[in-house]
Amino acid sequence: MCDYDGAMTIAEKTGNHREPRRVTAAMVAAHAGVSTATVSLVANGKSSGRVSAKNEQRVREAIRELGYIVDSIGSSLAKGVSSLVVLVAPDISNPFFAKVIAGVRSVLASDYQLMLSVTDAGVSPSASETRKILGLRPAGLLVHAPSQEFLEEIGGNLPMVVLDAPGISAKFPAVNMDVAQGARDVVAHFAAQGHTRAAYLDAITGTETLAVRREAFLQAAGDFGIEVLPSSVASSMIDVTAASAAFSEHWPSWKKAGVTALGCATDNHAFGVLHAARTLQIRIPQQLAVAGFDDLPYSATSNPAITSVQLNAQEGGRLAALKLRSLLEGKSPEPLQSMLPSSLVVRGSTVIDGDR
């Protein structure tokens, strides 16, 4: 029989491992000489200003001696209220997502546990994989760059907020980045530098945000009179090595076509281009101007530093968490959808130092 009073089963400290026993909050309370409510406050990190230092120390010593572990999921099931929030995101080795997570935690960490569900880099979240997580009965979901199909399958099951999915159904609470304006700013910058032929290195992915970046770049190129031939659009995985290989393959034809500027779907693509350019002895930016997206931390310290579209990932995470908190409290987020502005940070990969 399983009672959810906030404890997990462990082996007894008596040495009799044949009969595991549940260490409960009541046992900790008796050991420390305090109430179970006091144990709950200390164990859940809510004792500040509510429990005396002496009692807190006694509870912590009892927890350590007895091996008490809070069973958050069990407690949530018993109360009918979950304390688990799941963030579904691509490859978290990308520093962009570290900033998103920091923003989410700044809002939810005091009351919720954040669980990460990681998809393959640049791949839209899978509804079938996410359904497995729903078995944990989370309070809500934060989903980065889902497809419309994902929203149709998962969207009605529990509170959910979408991040960075421009163009996706407007009925879901969302926080988007103005990536279209960012792409236009890149093209405007190229035009101001006198470039008339450009190429674009896209990401092999089904995510809407990257499709919007590409289409906005191509549209703006036409508006500014910059030619982008169909053969001047290539793609690779969001990976430095893959991007380097893709650029190396296409550069001979791009050079022959007179390409002098290259837009990249992400800064990871731009890193790959710079790596290949050194091998191929291409001078950046004298022979080829290169701009990226996301303004990752290393973009400012690469050689040359990368011109990039800056997206406020931490603020995006914070706003998404605020919208989810509103949903969890039974309120409608205001506004339902938010758009964060982007900004172009100009560096040495597109202009020679002193010409900015």
Where in this protein do the model-derived segments appear?
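N-terminal helix-turn-helix DNA-binding module of bacterial transcription factors
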Residues: M1-G80
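Alpha-helical recognition/docking segments in bacterial nutrient-uptake
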Residues: M1-P20, S83-A188, A192, P252, ...
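Short beta-strand segments enriched in small/hydrophobic residues
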Residues: T36-L41, L77-D91, R197-I204
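Conserved hydrophobic residues forming the short capping helix/wall of the S-adenosyl-L-methionine
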Residues: I63, L108, A220-A221, W251, ...
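Hinge/beta->alpha junction and helix N-cap segments in small-molecule ligand-binding domains
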Residues: S72, P90-K99, S117-P125, V175-D185, ...
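Periplasmic-binding protein-like
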Residues: I133, R137-A145, R197-L201, V233, ...
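Flexible loop/turn connectors
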Residues: V228, E249-R356
